[in-house]
Amino acid sequence: EGDLSIPWRRMLSYREVRDFSVRVRNMPRKWEGSNTAVGDAIAFSAAQFGRVSDCERKVIDMSGDGSSNAGLNAAVERRKAEAAGIEINGIAIDIIGASITAFYSRFVITSDGFVVTSRGFSDYPRSIREKLLRELIKPGS
């Protein structure tokens, strides 16, 4: 089951982005200990772009510490999103013995997307920063 925690918004100033980050940081977690339905998350996220059709880029950012064990097929939903012009990037939180990075690489990210590996939850802040910089800063050539 998907849920939109914060409604879509256009952020054009530093203050708007800062206020948004404070709100996100202080949000309670909606689910804990539930199933992992990556395909459902992709489908739910892709449907949200209908509300903001004038976006220059459509990017879904996925992060998780598990592969799918419920819901829609992640690879099928990824193909649908990609056909709709949506890029999917991810942060795979790899915990001892689990290769979530391999799952994300094979079934979640689109051909123009990428996955960043987080070595556990304590490494997540570094990983999210790396991912955001990679998405927002165009490399010089």
What name fits each language-model region?
Residues 25-35, 64-68, 114-118:
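Second-shell loop/turn segments in exported
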Residues 1-4:
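Acidic helix-start/capping segments at beta-turn-to-alpha-helix junctions
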Residues 45-46, 56-70, 108:
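DG-centered beta-turn motif at the end of beta-strands
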Residues 11-58, 90-100, 123, 127:
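Von Willebrand factor
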Residues 66-107:
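VWA/integrin I-like adhesion module and closely mimicked acidic/polar interface patches used
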Residues 93-140:
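Von Willebrand factor A/integrin I-like adhesion domains
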